[in-house]
Amino acid sequence: MSVTGPQLLVAMDFNDINDCLALACQLDPQSCRLKIGKELFTTAGPAVVESVQKLGFDVFLDLKFHDIPNTVAGAVKAAANMGVWMVNVHASGGQRMMEAARESLVLFSHKPLLIAVTVLTSMDQSDLNGIGITESPEAMVARLASLAKLSGMDGVVCSALEAGAMKVQQGADFLTITPGIRPASTEAGDQRRVVTPEQAIANGSDFIVVGRPITQAEDPAAACAQIVNSIQ
């Protein structure tokens, strides 16, 4: 699958629709897309998706659906009805769940990209050990990614540290969306496995997710432009 349009996804990690729209108005939909996650969507609902779409932005609805197959299928279909560009599910929900999500989109002429989440970038080996998983983050990512591809997903969310291996294992057309991306001048925050935008793209990331380095910048538009220029 070829990558078209902006590769930068700005994480709109707000709890108020007005704060989201104030920032969106400073950004250029020709340079970036917007990621709307659980906190903002729970607070503002579909209205926030519609509002930023009216400003010209593609939306990645980052709700990481993980439930029984029928419930996830209904949620993915609802997201598609909103006209989102991308939506995601947890690969750990299993093959039947992911296949149900894919099948829910069959009748849509303009389907959103359907992406599976592998291992959250906040998790390292000690976190996995704590929930009874002894394999490395890299091994778990590879296993879940193979299951996601088998289930008909368009790609995965993974650390940029695994993006290159993902392309080798799953093929160049299998999309990689990588959070935990921070310019070298910023702190890592709560993301443990982080790389810079340039490193991420060089390592095989198709789309990079950046939050606070843009949303909390003194000049968000300039911060966004700097990242875009660094990956072109």
Curated annotation (Swiss-Prot):
CDD domains documented for this protein: OMP_decarboxylase_like (cd04725)
Function: Catalyzes the decarboxylation of orotidine 5'-monophosphate (OMP) to uridine 5'-monophosphate (UMP).
Signal sequence residues: none
PROSITE patterns per record: OMPDECASE
Residues at the active site: 64
Gene3D superfamilies in UniProt: Aldolase class I
Domain of life: Bacteria
Homology family: Belongs to the OMP decarboxylase family. Type 1 subfamily.
Pfam families for the chain: OMPdecase
GO cellular component, one term: cytosol
Protein name as annotated: Orotidine 5'-phosphate decarboxylase
Gene Ontology terms for molecular function: orotidine-5'-phosphate decarboxylase activity
Annotated metabolic or biological route of this protein: Pyrimidine metabolism; UMP biosynthesis via de novo pathway; UMP from orotate: step 2/2
